[in-house]
Amino acid sequence: MHSIDSNACVLALSPDQEPRLHVESGDEVTVRTLDCFSNTITDESQLFSTVGWDKVNPATGPIAVNGARPGDTLKVEILSIEVGEQATMTTHPDFGALPGTVEERTRIVPIRDGKAQFSDDITIPIRPMIGVIGTAPASESVPTGEPRQHGGNMDTKEIVAGSTLYLPVEVDGANLSLGDVHAVMGDGEVAVCGAEIEAEVKIRVTVLEGRPLPLPFLDSGDAVYAISSEIELMDAVKAVSYTH
C-alpha cells in the first residue's frame, strides 16, 4: 500500500508537473486530501473572501502509474473514503445560483455518527464523494476548479466508495490527482459548495492498455455514467451521445 499526504497538492492539472508518487498498475494508494478551502476555515467567523482563490480546490498528487501511455485508460477503483470531524459550508452573494439573495456566511457542520449536523433540527446522512479527480491533460494546464475531458472538478455525487472511475490517459504515467471531498452533496452546488471536508481516500489504479476513452466514465455498480463537461449544455449532450 502506497500513501501520499495532503501537503503534496496542486491547484491545476498539467502535463508539466513532476509526479509526487510513482506506483505500478494494480497498486493501492492511500490519498490524504485537504478540504476545498485548503483547511483554512476552521470556525464560522472566517468567511470565504478571506481564503483567496489561490487556496481553492487543492488536489493531492500527481500520482504517476508506471506504464500508462497516451491512448490508454486509467481505471480508478474507489475503495473507501474516510472523512474528518467537521465540514465547512459557505455562501457569498456573488457566487452560485442565487446571486444577490444570500449573505456571505460560513457554517461549520460537525460529523457525528455518520451524519452531518447542519443545525439542532437538521441532520443529513453523510455519503462521502470525491469532487475533483482527474489525469493530466495533454497540452495545457487546467485549474482544479474546472472539469474537462480528463476529469477535474466534475462534482459527480456518484464518485463514492464502491464506484469505479475510468479516465483518459493523455500523458505518460497518467498523473492522477484528487481532492475536494464532500461529506455529502446534492445534485449540484447551489451555493458553490457541498459539505466540504478533509479526507483519506483509498484507491486502486489499473492501466487498461490501448483502450482509449474520449471522456470519463463511471461505474457505480447500478449504472454506468458518461461524464461530459462543456460550456454549452447541448455540446455536453452531443459529447456523451457520440462516445461509441
Regions found by a protein language model. Give the residues of each.
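Intrinsically disordered, low-complexity linker/loop segments enriched in Gly/Pro
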Residues: S80-A161, Y166
